[in-house]
Curated annotation (Swiss-Prot):
InterPro entries: 6-PTP_synth/QueD, 6-PTP_synth/QueD_sf
Pathway terms, separated by semicolons: Purine metabolism; 7-cyano-7-deazaguanine biosynthesis
Family of the protein in this entry: Belongs to the PTPS family. QueD subfamily.
Name this polypeptide is given: 6-carboxy-5,6,7,8-tetrahydropterin synthase
Enzyme Commission numbers on file: 4.1.2.50
Binding site for Zn(2+): 16, 31, 33
Cofactor section: Zn(2+)
Pfam (any one): PTPS
Length: 121
């Protein structure tokens, strides 16, 4: 068998503010991002299908989470009252892992140059 990691990227638009930053910090003001989320799946490649998971299945599994995030104010979503990249990555993990057991990492990028990766506890 061959253990492999695959990934699928998603983008969504959302607004947020960080309530616990020092007064005057730019992230304390309402602002938005074009977020990028990468879901990584690690497992054995099925010898019959030649894949770990169908990309369409992964997309369908992420859709309910995507719809909760896209064009929303993240601070209003339960669990995202302090929506840092770190908190958002773990929150996405908690939504997706129950339906995609082979999920091995969630990457969240707020900008082209900044983000984080959550790999579970």
């Amino acid at each position: 068998m061959m253990s492999t990691t695959l990934f699928k990227d998603f983008t969504f638009e959302a607004a947020h503010r960080l309530p616990h930053v020092p007064e005057g910090h730019k992230c304390g003001r309402l602002h938005g991002h074009s977020f990028m989320v990468r879901l990584e799946i690690t497992g054995e490649v099925d010898p019959h299908t030649g894949w770990i998971i169908d990309f369409a299945e992964l997309k369908a599994a992420f859709k309910p989470t995507y719809e909760r995030l896209d064009h929303h104010y993240l601070n209003d979503i339960p669990g995202l009252e302090n929506p840092t990249s770190e908190v958002l990555a773990k929150w996405i993990w908690d939504q997706v892992k129950p339906v995609v057991p082979l999920l091995s990492a969630v990457m969240v990028k707020e900008t082209c140059t900044a983000g984080c990766i959550y790999r579970g506890e």
